[in-house]
Amino acid sequence: MRSYPPLAPPDTHCFAAAAGWLGLGNPREAEAELDAIRPEFQQHPDVLDVRWVVCAGQDDWPAALRVAQELLTTAPDLPSGWLHRSYALRRLPEGGGVEAAWNALLPAYPQFPEEQIIPYNLACYACLLGKLDEARDWFHRALKTSDAPRLCAMALGDEDLQPLWPEIHKLGQVKA
């Protein structure tokens, strides 16, 4: 995995303040702090990652998609760009949807086979698309890369996976 230069003061202060504002539930102030980071660091993966959270927190999915694309271009070796792009595509009011999210995330799995959230999200998308056999396969792949009881508990609260809930219960990983 590629190494990215660390942010340095004063940009670290703005970055920390942005994270603080997000923690307080104020994405607008977080965005203002990110905007204060010097131009040469605006494309830093950490800055883009937090900027995506700001956009998502404001339900600005077109902007979130643009930021995810920038992150993917800047740091294709990080799973966050792939995940953010598919998440934004799923929620995009026009030109997006579950199938677009599925198609965008599917190529990420071979690059990040140990990243549990990728097969988990693919299982969710497959369920929503009515591809239950594929959903089962993706969910089992996710189980292999994570704490199975924790993942099953999370899945049993995830409406996207509702068609698989009876099977997830039967896995014996979680007490009903």
State each model region's role.
Residues 1-4, 149-176:
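Terminal, low-structured helical/coil segments at or just beyond the last alpha-helical repeat
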